[in-house]
């Protein structure tokens, strides 16, 4: 039982500046979430301006905008972001070791340079290189921002603030598509020159992240100058850690959260001593099994088709809509994606991880399979076209409340502590690699027939449903550092010591 002093201390922490959603901790989190916004923006920015770049750079001189040359180059540009992210995510672990706030400052400075480079490009090779760099920055964000948020947040608000990362990603996607509406319709004839506004605007859209990055630097340099309390404590700066905790909790009495950080640091050190390398884990059947499950689950997420809709919806909608409605519908889709992230905060704890994953996959199958069959029968019917458009929205809703957020929660709950970091990183790497596999040929397949994509995504979602149903276990309510796939006795046998 807690004594009266401990109860008073806990009550003090709850009744001070940490109360409510809007508090000091939130301000630090929002400064980091500007990087999350950059993530979403950079993934989606090409969606609405790709065809205008084709015309200005003359990739299809005398031909249609979707000529073979432009289709191939567009495929490289779309996939290059994900290729860069693979490299960046691998480098991010090294960067955060030098400080969480420091890593955010590096990211913001990096995107200033990338934005300038992209906005002044005049050749395919330079824009391809700049998109690779954008992807590298996105890879850095995937680790740096969630870690900063987790360590700079009141313990009772980690879940609510943690979802802000995903919300700002979807908000960045929305803004990128919204700004693209100003470009208007793509000229009917590829030989028609772009208007002066269009020539300037698509470059300004590439430059826009520079403004957001400068804002992030200003906030972290002049207003939120402290490192996270966990990082400070880890580096032996206990008093500095205590001071920032006072700001986060709105109380001078922070002995309880300081002790929690101390325990976490000690547990982390113990985990490092007891950790099993990924190579060694792959040689042990029980560990290899859970690692493969995580990698397959992660890879299948991309084969639902989410990143084709996020990064290439305009190309997909061309077959179903007139030009003036294409970007408008993409904007509406991104709004739905943004708004439907909110319900996941509540239902993930109510329904559980496995149930949500199954429901999401079932929703995607119900959206895409009938649509694929209908398009196969008569793809010129107005009813079928409306069905195809509706299917993309059902898919977005199904994904946003399930596979989208739940995967990343599950990957940090399914692995035991001794392999969690390396196994989760490998699963994330598989996710990025599968994104490349899916996104790269999407332009080519859409040009051939969107029906093919509908069949692929519905078929893979059926595979994902069956895989989850038969192999994936529920992790809701599980203890931190444990795994439903490996018993304590099995873990102790391979670690050679007690595991708690």
From Swiss-Prot:
> Which keywords does UniProt give here?
Cell membrane, Disulfide bond, Membrane, Sugar transport, Transmembrane, Transmembrane helix, Transport
> Could you list which ranges are Extracellular topological domains?
47-75, 123-131, 188-203, 311-327, 378-390, 447-451
Q: Name one GO molecular function term.
A: hexose transmembrane transporter activity
Which intervals lie on the Cytoplasmic side per UniProt?
Answer: 1-25, 97-101, 153-166, 225-289, 349-356, 412-425, 473-500
For this protein, the record's PROSITE patterns field holds: MFS (PS50850), PROKAR_LIPOPROTEIN (PS51257), SUGAR_TRANSPORT_1 (PS00216), SUGAR_TRANSPORT_2 (PS00217)
The annotated modulation of its activity is:
Inhibited by cytochalasin B.
Q: Which Gene Ontology cellular-component terms appear in the entry?
A: plasma membrane
Give the reaction(s) catalysed: D-glucose(out) = D-glucose(in); D-fructose(out) = D-fructose(in); D-galactose(in) = D-galactose(out); D-mannose(out) = D-mannose(in)
InterPro entries to which the protein is assigned, alphabetical: GLUT, MFS_dom, MFS_sugar_transport-like, MFS_trans_sf, Sugar/inositol_transpt, Sugar_transporter_CS
Cysteine-cysteine disulfides: 60-67
Binding partners and assembly = Homodimer.
Protein name per its UniProtKB record: Hexose transporter 1
Q: Which organism is this protein's natural source?
A: Plasmodium knowlesi
Q: Which gene encodes it?
A: HT1
């Amino acid at each position: 039982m807690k004594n009266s002093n401990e109860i008073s201390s806990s009550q003090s922490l709850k009744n001070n500046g940490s109360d409510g959603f809007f508090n000091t901790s939130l301000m630090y989190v929002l400064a980091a979430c500007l990087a999350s916004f950059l993530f979403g923006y950079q993934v989606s920015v090409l969606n609405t301006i790709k065809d205008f770049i084709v015309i200005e750079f003359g990739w299809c001189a005398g031909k249609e905008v979707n000529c073979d040359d432009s289709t191939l180059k567009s495929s490289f540009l779309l996939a290059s972001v994900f290729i860069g992210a693979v490299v960046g995510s691998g480098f991010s672990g090294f960067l955060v070791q030098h400080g969480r706030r420091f890593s955010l400052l590096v990211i913001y400075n990096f995107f200033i340079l990338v934005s300038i480079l992209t906005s002044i490009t005049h050749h395919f090779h330079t824009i391809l290189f700049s998109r690779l760099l954008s992807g590298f920055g996105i890879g850095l964000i995937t680790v740096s921002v969630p870690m900063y948020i987790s360590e700079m947040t009141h313990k009772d608000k980690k879940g609510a603030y943690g979802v802000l990362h995903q919300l700002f990603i979807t908000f960045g996607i929305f803004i990128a598509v919204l700004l693209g509406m100003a470009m208007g319709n793509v000229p009917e004839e590829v030989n028609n020159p772009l208007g002066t506004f269009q020539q300037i605007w698509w470059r300004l859209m590439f430059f826009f992240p520079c403004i957001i990055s400068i804002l992030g630097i200003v906030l972290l340099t002049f207003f939120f100058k402290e490192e996270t309390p966990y990082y400070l404590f880890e580096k032996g700066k206990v008093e500095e850690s205590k001071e920032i905790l006072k700001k986060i909790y709105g109380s001078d009495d922070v002995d309880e959260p300081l002790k929690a950080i101390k325990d976490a640091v000690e547990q982390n050190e113990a985990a490092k001593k007891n950790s099993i390398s990924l190579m060694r884990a792959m040689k042990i059947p029980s560990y290899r099994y859970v690692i493969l499950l995580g990698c397959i689950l992660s890879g299948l997420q991309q084969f639902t088709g989410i990143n084709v809709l996020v990064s290439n919806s305009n190309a997909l909608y061309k077959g179903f809509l007139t030009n003036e409605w294409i970007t408008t519908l993409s904007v509406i889709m991104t709004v739905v994606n943004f708004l439907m992230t909110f319900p996941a905060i509540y239902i993930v704890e109510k329904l559980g991880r496995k149930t949500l994953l199954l429901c999401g996959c079932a929703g995607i199958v119900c959206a895409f399979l009938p649509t694929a069959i209908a398009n196969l029968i008569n793809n010129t019917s107005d009813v079928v076209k409306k069905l195809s458009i509706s299917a993309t929205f059902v898919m977005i809703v199904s994904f946003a409340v399930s596979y989208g957020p739940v995967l990343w929660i599950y990957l940090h709950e399914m692995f035991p502590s001794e392999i969690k970091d390396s196994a989760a990183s490998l699963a994330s790497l598989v996710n990025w690699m599968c994104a490349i596999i899916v996104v790269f040929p999407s332009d080519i397949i859409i040009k051939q027939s969107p029906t093919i994509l509908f069949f692929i995504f519905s078929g893979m979602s059926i595979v994902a449903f069956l895989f989850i149903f038969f192999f994936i276990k529920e992790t809701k309510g599980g203890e931190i550092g444990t795994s439903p796939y490996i018993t304590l006795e099995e873990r102790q046998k391979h670690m050679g010591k007690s595991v708690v």
